[in-house]
UniProtKB/Swiss-Prot annotation:
Active-site residues, as the UniProt record annotates them: H251
InterPro entries with a match to the protein in the record: CoA-bd, CoA_lig_alpha, NAD(P)-bd_dom_sf, SUCC_ACL_C, Succinyl-CoA_synth-like
Coiled-coil residue spans: none
Designated name of the protein: ADP-forming sulfoacetate-CoA ligase subunit SqwL
Pfam families in the record: CoA_binding, Ligase_CoA
Binding-site residues for CoA, renumbered to this chain: T17, G18, S19, E20, K43, I96, A97, D98
Assigned keywords, A-Z: Carbohydrate metabolism, Ligase, Nucleotide-binding
SUPFAM superfamilies recorded: NAD(P)-binding Rossmann-fold domains, Succinyl-CoA synthetase domains
The keyword Nucleotide-binding is assigned to this record: yes
Length: 296
């Protein structure tokens, strides 16, 4: 069972007529995603990959039931697009935009919490359940990376996602649902908020998190395990072990500040909670074996 999106999820694409939107809409459909409509202001009546385009989400809802929406819009337009979707009652939103203004991302997260909705991103590749559906920009056709299986994956990094997931597959496992929470300082939703969904999913035997220095998301995962609300095996790989304090490393969120966010502190907390931490991607599969997770 996919935890965020599956073949039954009715998906809208906001920004569908742009080059990124149209390109990835085709790949989303190719994988099996049920994309039913698109939204681009001023483009109502057009068709993209056989999908009708509407001026607004409100107009689209007059003709379609929408479960989730995928945003391919510029950073400075993201807040308005997310709020439009939330006001329409859509509870699952993915935005890949990199560089959403920090204060606007804070507003987005607060509004999503108030609406009991999930906003995945920004600065993410999105969400994918291999062989089922995706919302985002994953190279899903690479079988050695995106093979269906029983390992849930959450990640803050795009490039590390491909590397670690490839190692999971090489070790004899596959992926149930992969969620890229994004690499910005304020994501729409955090690792720990998705753990209850993986806990309830009978097809997910274990979870792998791909984290990095900065922020406190990995520490929140450790706290969730210690509280006993997540009980499945968990393995982590954390990038940035040798990064100097105060130096941003690739992502805006990958920075150690105020004595918090160091990889060493994250490792200590995760291991104290009973999770395993791999010191390199290739060891993730071995640690899953050590935790008794059966192969797919």
């Amino acid at each position: 069972m996919s935890i965020f999106i599956d073949r039954e999820t009715k998906v809208c694409v906001q920004g569908i007529t742009g080059s990124e939107g149209s390109f990835w809409t085709k790949h989303m459909i190719d994988l099996g995603t049920d994309v039913i409509c698109g939204v681009t202001p001023g483009k109502e009546g057009q068709m993209v990959e056989g999908i009708p385009v509407y001026h607004s989400v409100k107009n689209a809802l007059k003709h379609h039931k929408i479960d989730a929406t995928m945003l391919f819009v510029p950073p400075k337009m993201t807040k308005d697009a997310v709020f439009e979707a939330l006001e329409a009652g859509i509870k699952k939103i993915v935005t890949i935009a990199d560089g959403i203004p920090l204060h606007e991302m804070m507003e987005i997260r607060q509004r999503a919490l108030e609406e009991n909705a999930f906003v995945v991103g920004g600065n993410t590749s999105g969400v994918i359940s291999p062989k089922e559906a995706m919302m985002g920009s994953f190279p899903h056709w690479i079988e050695r990376v995106y093979k269906k299986g029983s390992i849930g994956v959450m990640t803050r990094s795009g490039s590390l996602t491909n590397e670690v997931t490839a190692m999971i597959v090489e070790a004899g496992y596959g992926v149930s649902s992969l969620i890229g929470v994004g690499g910005d300082p304020v994501p729409g939703a955090r690792f720990a908020e998705f753990l209850p969904l993986y806990q309830k999913d009978p097809e997910t035997k274990a979870v792998v998190i791909i984290g990095e220095l900065g922020g406190t998301m990995e520490e929140e995962v450790a706290e969730t395990i210690l509280k006993g609300t997540f009980t499945k095996p968990l393995v982590a790989f954390l990038g940035g072990r040798t990064a100097p304090k105060g130096q941003k490393m690739g992502h805006a969120g990958a920075i150690i500040t105020g004595g918090k966010g160091s990889v060493q502190n994250k490792i200590e907390m995760l291991e104290k909670a009973g999770a395993k931490v791999a010191d390199r991607p290739r060891k993730v599969g071995k640690l899953l074996e050590e935790l008794g997770v059966t192969k797919d």
